Amino acid sequence: TDTVYGIGCDLMNRKSIERLCHVKNIKPHKLNLSFICSDLSNISEYARKIDTPIFKILKKALPGPYTFILESSSKVPKILDVNKKSVGIRIPYHNIPLAIVKQLGNPLISASIKDDDIIKEYTTDPEEIYETFKHKVDIVIDGGTGGNIASSVIDCTGEKIVVVRKGLGDVEFLGLWSDIRPGKNSNI
């Protein structure tokens, strides 16, 4: 993506999601993965009603290196078979994941490819990724050397907007919005 390499699958394919969990060694009920969507209208299917101030932030930041935690729609638990109240959603500024999402017609569910190395947090070399995952996944796409800084994670589910992780995406513009309470300031 526009941040670090990720591993993902079709959000609507339960067997692929189970396989992704197996590859990442994650228990399905502890799933904390993000969805890669193609555009803002795509987000509305997977997030509950988005208030105007939050929508303005999404519109300003996306596509870009941000993951927004939003209240999940009723569609999310049915897909993932878990009772998740929130979901991380991304629209990366990168042609490869956006082309995959458009071709599938569904978002991708994804997770960053972490590295066991204590010096570097993320694997950035596509050849190294291929060697690690070639027998575990259907395809590895070489998008060139990846970045080593993850997306900024912004939680929009509480009383105030909270920066959970400061990553590649500039969060300074959120200073203007720090006192917004979702659902309370819809006139902004």
Name each model-derived stretch:
Residues D2-I188:
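Active-site-adjacent structural elements in enzyme catalytic cores
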